[in-house]
Amino acid sequence: MSNPSPQVPEGEASTSVCRPKSSMASTSRRQRRERRFRRYLSAGRLVRAQALLQRHPGLDVDAGQPPPLHRACARHDAPALCLLLRLGADPAHQDRHGDTALHAAARQGPDAYTDFFLPLLSRCPSAMGIKNKDGETPGQILGWGPPWDSAEEEEEDEASKEREWRQKLQGELEDEWQEVIGRFEDDASHETQEPESFSAWSDRMAREHAQKRQQQRETEGACRPPRAEGSSHSWRQQEEEQRLFRERARAKEEELRESQARRAQEAPRDPVPEPARAGPRAEHPRGAGRGSLWRFGDVPWPCPGGGDPEAMAAALVARGPPLEEQGALRRYLRVQQVRWHPDRFLQRFRSQIETWELGRVMGAVTALSQALNRHAEALK
């Protein structure tokens, strides 16, 4: 006698069939709404696009190929870019070629730097280290030289190279110091100095090294060309300018901290809201912030007030060692390349520069860095 097959209740059977259908229908509706959202952006109907996302907050604003941020950069559509960033679009999102929105903005040239590249960089600085399938970072597309060091192992490698170079320089300076101090062992007026910082010690070593070289040239009676005769003066002038650069940077940082502390103390006592501002220029009037944030002329350029990047690079080279000393000149140029590299400069001084001057300052720093790279290549 055969057992009857178990009967599934009619309600459960209908539920099991409807679940995948309802899930597929929900996915299809979401995809249609996302396509409609992208059409609104392409047509410039930003209010409709924002209203659609408010009614359906689960939509993916990065969906599509190319993604909406990439399309806004390619079309030079700054209002759409600002809306997407406000709605939570991810600048690090990659398309099928591995490009981020920063890659797309970098390919639009200098005209898109202020309106597209800087807002994306401010929202997601880590995207500068993302490479596409061709192995390029946004900084390489802009011609900034070495890629942005975003991975921890690359940062450690760069730090180890920097430490190795400093140790080698310290060893050479110690050898020179031993030679110099041997000449003054019998000097009764020589006093033991207190321990000093590494920066002060290295500056003193460089000055004494230059004096020793000058004394050797005088005793040997060697005739130098005009460039070599003025090299010691240029070297001392360059050291003085480096010292002034450090002092101005420290003074600006101290002024910024004091200004922030003063504003924090005055904020509770002044509850009156600020009046509405007319535009981006109104946020930073030309007379305001002079004592706390840098404008273009406040940056310690190699030439007073900035100027032509080639002229600034030539001025830096002229202040270095003479052309006959190839090794010393290459080391000097390496220090200047590190100091004026756009990535390093942006990381170190971004908070000290007026926002509305940042594009102009970074454009000049980029041009100066490229000019220094050309001088360094010419020495190889």
From Swiss-Prot:
Keywords: ANK repeat, Nucleus, Phosphoprotein, Repeat. It comes from Sus scrofa (Pig). ANK repeats lie at residues 64-93, 97-133. Residues 204-221, 236-272 have a biased composition (Basic and acidic residues). The modification Phosphoserine is found at S150. Its main location: nucleus. Transmembrane segments: none annotated. This is NF-kappa-B inhibitor-like protein 1. The gene is NFKBIL1. SUPFAM superfamilies: Ankyrin repeat. Residues 1-34, 131-167, 185-293 are annotated as: Disordered.
